[in-house]
Amino acid sequence: MSEQSPRDPVAASENRKPSFRFDADIFKLCTRYLEENNYHGLALIARQKGLPPFLRLRIWPILLKHHPFVLNPFLQPDNDVLNKPKHDSDQDDRAEGQLNDEDIRFNIKKDLKKYVQRLKYNSSPDINEIEMEMLEVLEKAIFKFVKKWGKIIKYDQAITWIALGLAEWLPPIENTHWVLIGRDVSSSDNLYITNIMDEYSTYIENVPDLEDYLNDVIASPQMKFSDVFERLVLVLLHSPENRTRSPSSKVNKTTLPLNGGTIEDRVSFFIYCLRKLLPELSDYFQEEQILNKFGSNDDEWLIWWLKWCGSKVWSRMDRGRIWDMILGWRLQNPKKSTAYYQDKLKLTKHQLEKLGPDVFWSVSQHDEETVDERGEPDEFKKSDSFKDLLHGLSMANISASSSNTNSPSESTSPLLTPTRRSSSSSTSLSEGIDDMNIPFSRLDPHIELVFISLALLKSKEGTLVELDQHEIRQFLSRLPTKSYNYTTRYQKYKQMKMEKEKEEDNGNGSVSSEASNSDGGSQIITNDNANSRRYDFMDNVVNEAGELWRKWFWSEAVDNE
């Protein structure tokens, strides 16, 4: 993003508007699901396309309420909690809790103050009444969580940063539109809060009656911020139960993608995949002593990425898109038929085509005649070792589902199969029902995050290889946003192209949208100003993560021959 003076109200206002584009049909589907409180449909859109940012304040609480990790929570206990000797009486526990309360509150306030100082560039910033009230809500929510779950995980500054990340999209003060502004932009009046509706005003103005609809959404009853925050932490920090925590235990690469693992497992898996998928960057990291002595504070950026799901270190926009995926993560219940979900979702084939397959799809061991995207035979299906690897993943998935009825892992459709649908344009739900495969999640969400993190590194590889050790760690600890301004030259090219297309279409195009020819006449509504066009490449990063997953999967198949 181009640098603008925080004292220039015009520049700051323009700079503050984030890039956002969304298919009009999917947006209508999203609002329909929201009105119906259809959490199945909202989860589907969240994981496939991401959510309209200005609707997260209402949709995230719904997704969290019904998330499998909230219905059946499990947090990986801290090592010092695991090794802590049991007290002989409850009195010792109460005494320790009383002693820690003041310290916990002090630490929470201190970490909240760091956020304010970071945005206001002042060690003693002035705080207005609304900002003060927001900080009080955050402090109470964090303290409430620590008091409830403190015997499993102790307070860490990252818990406060998760609350701050939530407050960047969910107004802490009920029935208001005030959210934290984030670190990507500066405020002309030195505020660290913003009206989320003003941020997306260009988009909202392009959709008839949307402003009134959003005002009704804000005015309606909402879940308390503290309750949403607790559920969010349970999802982001979820860990599978009954894992062997011995330091000498090896990561099982055939079960980890589906069952997930501890943060130690995921870090080891990340480094392994980095060496295999991005060898040149991995070699450069090794030269610069990056990730060579993991466990110290030198490379704590990776813990922020993988354990704390990008809190603090990722930009507000990028992190919001990834949290959409995590909150929308759902496995298909093996006890429910395809017809059950189709009845719940009421999707047409055209809508399913727009939503696309699960990002982390792969081939199925059950398909005898698997073809690639060009319709040609898929050669690597001939590898018995590939089938063995896939069979191992299948068995791990079935085992996980049988041990956890609240978050079933087995799918009634072939495991790890890309969604392939008929090219028919029929929209009848009664026709071709077997072809309408609804895209459910396949991998554990924290393993998805591993591949997303690798894709982020790949997108920044050209920059990283030009930096030294200190600069690399600083860069990865404050990753720039993927949304950037188009160059003037490209703006002129785009304008000429749009004018030419408009002439060819005899002026039939929509003024408030960008036509997407590849989507068969889709209408794409944008939040970008015509004179300051930007584009958010986070969807490209997500898609690249899927490609890296398949590349890793194929590589493992070849290596096991």
From Swiss-Prot:
Show the ranges annotated as biased composition (Polar residues). Answer: 507-529
Q: Which keywords, in A-to-Z order, does the entry hold?
A: Cytoplasm
Q: Name one GO cellular component term.
A: cytoplasm
Boundaries of every Rab-GAP TBC domain copy: 50-330
* Compositional bias ranges of the Low complexity kind: 399-430
Q: Which Gene3D superfamilies match?
A: Ypt/Rab-GAP domain of gyp1p, domain 3
Where is it located?
Cytoplasm
What are the boundaries of the region Disordered?
Answer: 399-434, 498-529
InterPro entries per the record? Rab-GAP-TBC_dom, Rab-GAP_TBC_sf
The entry assigns this protein to a family as follows: Belongs to the OCA5 family.
**What's this protein's name?**
Oxidant-induced cell-cycle arrest protein 5
Q: Which organism is it from?
A: Meyerozyma guilliermondii (strain ATCC 6260 / CBS 566 / DSM 6381 / JCM 1539 / NBRC 10279 / NRRL Y-324) (Yeast)
